[in-house]
């Protein structure tokens, strides 16, 4: 069994409600975690009504990426706006 990056202390999820995990399914529908984060999952770049939104201007983004972490919001195949991880 492989231990996850979270389990190894190499990843963290921040404020999951406002920064959900979003992936398109094969049938064109969306998988969103947590499901209650759906109102915050789309058109994030143009919205100012999302409290605690992590984006490229956010302090959490700047601090984590400056420390060498990768942000899940930059991923192409899915968006994991809550997620930061680092490889050691």
Report the location of each language-model feature.
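Catalytic cores and adjacent binding grooves of peptidoglycan-active enzymes
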Residues: 3, 8-88
